[in-house]
Amino acid sequence: YIGFGSMTAGDMAETLDIAREAVLLSGVRAVLSTGWGGVDVPPAENLYVAGFVPHDWLFDRVSAVVHHGGAGTTAAGITAGRPTLVVPFGGDQPFWATRVKALGIGPHAIPRDRLTAPRLARALVDLTETPKYRVAARELGERLRLEQGEFIAANIIEHELRKWLREEDRAPDPVLEHNHAEPPAPAGPPD
């Protein structure tokens, strides 16, 4: 999978052309998501071009993911246990690129402003053929899935909400007290 999600910075047509050329140079098979780019990219024998595809469905069916490094896409790739290459555009994306490398689930990032087809082609081969990335990504994905993060987060939110509602029941509400108070006496005639 190669996709840059909601990224519209710079020339997305150029970015997608670089990705397409890298797939052709490397010989890997890929799904290229055009995302919000609104760009037409010609398919090839080893390249399927798609608009938006649900990551939680697709990432289970690919061998690796290449993306912009948004928190959501990074988490989806890790949860699926897939080696990851980040092409950060800006914002928090360099942070996630650093984490991917530190966790051993992918190679050094290629910042968007340094992205070339030959550089990406080499990274695609490295990403898909280096066993240590596959092993580390699979192990991390298994650990993450065992955490049941959504279930735990929902329980914490519900617990805190119940606690907050109980505190609200005990605390006086100045607005309600004001609404139930006796109206003030009318003012007398001016002196």
In which residue ranges do the predicted regions lie?
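A donor-sugar binding/catalytic signature common to diverse glycosyltransferases
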Residues: 50-99
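C-terminal amphipathic helix plus adjacent low-complexity
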Residues: 117-191
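Short, contiguous acidic/charged loop-to-helix segments that flank catalytic cores in large enzymes
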Residues: 7-11, 49, 87-91, 110-113
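Residues at alpha-helix caps and immediate loop-helix transition turns in enzyme cores, especially N-
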Residues: 11-15, 96, 149
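Donor-nucleotide binding loops and adjacent catalytic segments primarily
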Residues: 1-64, 178-180, 191
